[in-house]
């Protein structure tokens, strides 16, 4: 085991100097011990029964077909109750599992499925009989019908050329990467509170009343609204049928058990499942079970980017918690145990990416169902309550990768709550991530969201926010590798990785640029060319998706969908906010490279462009002095106005183009800096860059500094983020910011106060997102050498935490190479 002078609590647990307290958690640890670190398996039932129904309903409105398919799945798929569990509702076999969505990527099955058990990243087992059913029954139906095939067919050649690396579109080019062919929707947050307060019988009655009020002489009412409302009625039946089947299973299991304690647990489970989600929840246990049914049935409905988030759990569960505590029918420990039963079942659902690109972008069995706590009420008051603290306690006491815990921070966040956040950060497992109300709320309001709803946002995905009854944009986004713009500028429109293929603009021989202004204008031309191709790609994506996807459950829980009688996947829903976005990949890599060229070539003339090109073409072998000069040029992340001003201008003209696309496409387009793990594969196709980075090395992630380039401490990193933002522009959104700290610098009471201070500074600067890794480099290196001794090591990756040993060596090295700040 690693021997470090100061360990985080997580590291102490790993080394045995601090024991894991299982007392009071015997139930959840029994479940966890059975499934943790097992290789997940593929469950085909969702795909099988969904396909069976879709085969029978061709020609009907897609939303209606989808609802009928969900009902078929609800009636036929096997239901399970995990031994020792207090909650019912899973969508696959016992153990860790993933499910399939052939409507998205069934055309990949023949090429990809056979390799699932042996692939390097996130392998899955599959039963041979299931494989046969998949290939003989399921895949043939979807041939020629999948969304991916349609998109690949209609993309113009010049857009395909930056999107896919092969004719079939199986592999991304990693230049302008669409994400819509491996997910049917972006991350989503259902309106759980509506289901809890009203129940699906009442929601269904609303649809029936609307149906009865239609004008059946009106063509729109007959052909669009009528089948939509019929779909809403059917999907309400579907989720209630599914719940009732769990109730019956619980009764049958109770009858067969000899353990009197377990028998009573199962009988109570049966009673709860017969009541919710059909009727309003009456207590905390019913509210939690209702939430879990909605969350898991949402997974049957669609592949929402691995993320059906939990929403503001401390808000919508609190009335039930408070009532039960006051009446003496629930203790805080019982509430915690019930929630941890949810966490441990959540950990068993593993998002399965058949698409090779999706698997590259979501390493480490990534999925992140964020629990949002803290923040403000719709009236603008501090929203912290007893449950907010309980979620933080659970994360410290029962450390797991699931759920992702996200805390909303504002200028009036209580010191006591901030202290508990600091203690959780100190633990070292990367939780919680922080989202800043002072940036998010006014920005969403300016973009058109009513202020009370902007104040009530939930965190969804890595750093995204959702307003469950106002958001209507579900389409996939695009990841743009702007380091390719830099390389194409230095290589006349070409990338070394792809040989002589012309991918960008032919901007000429870079040695002929006489001034920085000429060079920078040529860079902007390459950059904007990528943006324009990305916007064209996404325009096509947005037009195709309503032909392939529907979401009746999400729609019936969405006020605007019910008001307008439109499916959530409709192209435009009146009253909704459409926040489209694209991801900026390689921000600090580009900025540092531009700063080095400007400083060393054009201003100080210490290097010629030819010398820089020769050094890069040799991957700096034999040119180490030049590499050091480039590395020592001004770098983003150090509160250096030289680099930060370039960063701000790059962000500025990128937002200008986003605003133009917003006008052209009739939706709001934002620039975001959230890579997940895509900066690793994106970096593999990029040759050496002018900031001294070697070929194939990962790009800088999010809005963080380049690895090893931030020398002036975390406050300087925050200030660079602040100075590089264009606060006067509104085509901006989330910026993912990783900061890695040594455990020693944040140890003890003083360390907690330091964390509180840096969070307050971050909040005052109105930055969007912040998350910490607090782990010794020696621990990470030891885990690479001896993974079996470090199976429980959790680290922060992008907007999620994952087990370090579940990652590829490339991603592990990316985390190791992040700058570790030893002082605050």
UniProtKB/Swiss-Prot annotation:
Chain sites annotated for binding (2S)-3-sulfopropanediol: 183, 187, 462, 464, 672
Record-level Gene Ontology MF annotations: lyase activity
GO biological process, one term: alkanesulfonate catabolic process
Glycine radical sites (modified residues): 799
Keyword Cell division on entry: no
PTM characteristics: Requires the activating protein HpsH to generate the key active site glycyl radical on Gly-799 that is involved in catalysis.
EC number(s) stated in the UniProt entry for this protein: 4.4.1.41
UniProt catalytic activity: (2S)-3-sulfopropanediol = hydroxyacetone + sulfite + H(+)
Domain named PFL: residues: 26-694
Metabolic or biological pathway, per its Swiss-Prot or TrEMBL entry: Organosulfur degradation; alkanesulfonate degradation
Keywords: Lyase, Organic radical
Keyword Ribosomal protein attributed: no
Domain Glycine radical: 701-824
Active site per database record: 462, 464
Transmembrane feature ranges: none
Entry GO terms, CC: cytosol
Role of this protein: Involved in the degradation of the organosulfur compound 2(S)-dihydroxypropanesulfonate (DHPS). Catalyzes the radical-mediated C-S bond cleavage of DHPS to form sulfite and hydroxyacetone. Can also catalyze isethionate desulfonation, but with much lower efficiency.
Similarity field: Belongs to the glycyl radical enzyme (GRE) family.
Name by which UniProt lists this protein: (2S)-3-sulfopropanediol sulfolyase
């Amino acid at each position: 085991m690693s021997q470090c002078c100061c360990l985080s609590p997580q590291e102490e647990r790993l080394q045995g100097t601090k024991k894991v307290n299982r007392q009071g958690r015997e139930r959840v640890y029994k479940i966890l011990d059975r499934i943790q670190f097992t290789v997940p398996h593929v469950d085909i039932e969702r795909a099988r029964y969904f396909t069976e129904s879709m085969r029978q309903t061709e020609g009907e409105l897609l939303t209606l077909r989808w609802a009928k398919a969900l009902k078929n799945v609800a009636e036929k798929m096997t239901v399970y109750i995990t031994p020792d569990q207090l909650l019912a509702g899973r969508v696959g076999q016992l153990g860790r599992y993933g499910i399939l969505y052939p409507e998205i990527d069934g055309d990949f099955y023949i090429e990809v499925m056979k390799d699932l058990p042996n692939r390097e990243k996130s392998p899955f087992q599959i039963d041979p009989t299931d494989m046969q059913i998949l290939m003989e029954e399921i895949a043939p139906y979807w041939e020629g019908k999948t969304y991916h095939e349609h998109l690949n067919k209609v993309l113009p050649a010049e857009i395909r050329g930056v999107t896919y690396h092969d004719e079939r579109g199986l592999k991304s080019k990693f230049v302008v990467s669409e994400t819509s062919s491996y997910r049917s929707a972006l991350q989503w947050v259902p309106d759980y509170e509506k289901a809890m307060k009203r129940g699906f019988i009442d929601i269904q009655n609303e649809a029936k009343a609307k149906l009865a009020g239609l004008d059946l002489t009106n063509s729109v009412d007959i052909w669009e609204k009528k089948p939509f409302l019929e779909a809403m009625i059917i999907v309400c039946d579907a989720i209630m049928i599914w719940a009732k089947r769990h109730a019956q299973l619980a009764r049958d299991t109770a009858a067969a058990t000899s353990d009197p304690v377990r028998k009573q647990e199962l009988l109570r489970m049966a009673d709860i499942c017969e009541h919710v989600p059909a009727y309003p929840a009456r207590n905390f246990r019913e509210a939690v079970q209702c939430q879990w049914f909605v969350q898991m049935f949402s997974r049957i409905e669609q592949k929402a980017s691995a993320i059906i988030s939990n929403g503001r759990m401390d808000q919508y569960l609190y009335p039930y918690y408070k009532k039960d505590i006051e009446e003496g029918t629930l203790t805080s420990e019982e509430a915690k145990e019930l929630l941890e039963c949810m966490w441990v079942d959540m950990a068993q659902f593993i998002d399965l990416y058949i698409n090779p690109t999706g698997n590259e972008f979501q390493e480490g069995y990534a999925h992140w169902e964020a629990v949002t706590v803290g923040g403000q009420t719709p009236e603008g008051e501090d929203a912290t309550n007893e449950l907010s603290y309980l979620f933080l306690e659970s994360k410290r006491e029962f450390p797991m990768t699931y759920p992702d815990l996200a805390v909303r921070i504002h200028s009036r966040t209580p010191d006591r709550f901030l202290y508990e956040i600091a203690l959780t950060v100190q633990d070292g497992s990367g939780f919680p991530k922080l989202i800043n109300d002072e940036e998010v709320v006014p920005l969403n309001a300016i973009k058109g969201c009513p202020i009370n709803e902007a104040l009530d946002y939930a965190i969804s995905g890595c750093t995204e926010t959702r307003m469950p009854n106002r958001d209507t944009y579900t389409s996939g986004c695009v990841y743009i590798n702007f380091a390719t713009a830099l390389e194409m500028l230095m290589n006349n429109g070409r990338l070394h990785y792809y040989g002589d293929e012309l991918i960008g603009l032919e901007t000429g021989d870079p040695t002929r640029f006489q001034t920085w202004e000429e060079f920078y204008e040529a860079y902007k031309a390459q950059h904007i060319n990528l943006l324009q191709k990305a916007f064209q790609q996404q325009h096509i994506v947005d037009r195709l998706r309503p032909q392939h996807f529907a979401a009746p459950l999400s729609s019936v829980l969405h006020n605007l969908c019910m008001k307008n009688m439109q499916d959530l996947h409709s192209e435009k829903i009146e009253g909704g906010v459409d926040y489209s976005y694209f991801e900026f990949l390689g921000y600090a890599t580009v900025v540092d490279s531009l700063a080095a060229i400007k400083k060393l070539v054009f201003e100080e003339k210490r290097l010629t462009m030819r010398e820089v090109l020769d050094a890069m073409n040799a991957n700096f072998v034999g040119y180490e002095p030049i590499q050091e000069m480039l590395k020592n040029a001004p770098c983003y992340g150090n509160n250096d106005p030289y680099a930060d001003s370039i960063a701000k201008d790059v962000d500025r003209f990128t937002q200008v183009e986003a605003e133009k696309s917003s006008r052209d496409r009739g939706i709001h387009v934002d620039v975001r800096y959230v890579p997940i793990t895509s900066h690793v594969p994106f970096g593999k196709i990029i040759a050496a860059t002018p900031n001294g980075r070697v070929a194939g090395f990962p790009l800088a992630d999010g809005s963080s500094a380049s690895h090893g380039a931030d020398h002036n401490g975390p406050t300087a990193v925050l200030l660079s983020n602040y100075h590089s933002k264009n606060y006067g522009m509104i085509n901006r959104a989330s910026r993912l910011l990783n900061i890695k700290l040594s455990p020693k610098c944040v140890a003890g009471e003083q360390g907690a106060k330091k964390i509180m201070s840096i969070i307050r500074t971050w909040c005052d600067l109105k930055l969007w997102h912040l998350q910490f890794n607090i782990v010794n480099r020696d621990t990470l290196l030891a885990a690479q050498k001896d993974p079996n001794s470090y199976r429980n090591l959790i680290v922060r990756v992008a907007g999620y935490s994952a087990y370090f040993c579940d990652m590829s060596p490339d991603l592990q090295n990316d985390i190791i190479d992040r700058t570790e700040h030893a002082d605050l």
